[in-house]
Amino acid sequence: MTHPAYGVLRQVSPTASVLLENNPSSMTLEGTNSWVLRAPGASSCVIVDPGYDDRPHLELLAAVAPVALILLTHHHPDHADGAPWLASAVSAPVRAFDASLCLDGDALQADEVLSVAGLEIGVLHTPGHTADSVSFRVGGEVLTGDTILGRGTTVLDDLGAYLGSLRVLAELPEGTPGLPGHGPELPDLRATAREYLAHREQRLDQVRGALRELGPDATPRQVVELVYADVDRALWVPAEHSVRAQLEYLRTL
């Protein structure tokens, strides 16, 4: 698969540019968005989510500008695996919410504000996709990692935590641009978060209906076969992961 954005740093806003990694799949869409944050006129930059340990992609990131900091939205390999090589290549620290991912830097804290490379970057802890998922607020924009994608919906570990994260994002100012970990930019992240909330409530209603039909001890696979009968079977494995999170959520109510 080819894509015109592979290998090309694309300016999205005065502060943010994106380099699309060539790792397309049903889960990553066209590939991982590696974000380069750079204040106008600044000599250095911040890189968010270097992606896989893909040397051509990482070498392009390393060549953009001196790198002051590498940030990770979460631990999944399509976002984080390239961080150690890039950190060594550009002599920059790595920071993430999960301390085990950090290199020469402290773990990120919820609501922390980072002052780096002429930027003020706010840390929003947005768990649900993973426990360590964070979003970054830079100026009027928010980098969402896999918490909200540019297209479609994300896979969940913890639905209760995820609904809380969506409610936080749903209170952002109207028209806040969203810069996701996969897929195109979102013109209004608040509106998208509210759409995600409505979608999750709809899915929960479907799962409740499936449990009424199948019985309270139905397995995630049985629920997927009923609720996702009209969905491509290639997506049933991630759907089963999300249904498991929904069942766990419903069984704690």
Kindly give the residue locations of the regions a language model identified:
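Metallo-beta-lactamase
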Residues: A42-I47, Y52-D53, E120-H125, T130-A210
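Glycine/proline-rich low-complexity segments that form flexible loops, beta-turns, and polyproline
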Residues: M1-T2, H129
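Histidine-centered divalent metal-coordination motifs
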Residues: T73-H79, H129, H182, Q246
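Active-site HxH/HxHxD metal-binding segment of metal-dependent hydrolases
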Residues: N23-G31, C45, P50-G122
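C-terminal regulatory/interaction regions
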Residues: A210-L253
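Conserved beta-strand hairpin/beta-sheet module of binuclear metal-dependent hydrolase folds
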Residues: T2-A63, V134-T147
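A structural signal for the main folded, soluble domain(s) of proteins
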Residues: L9-Q11, V36, G41-S44, V67-I70, ...
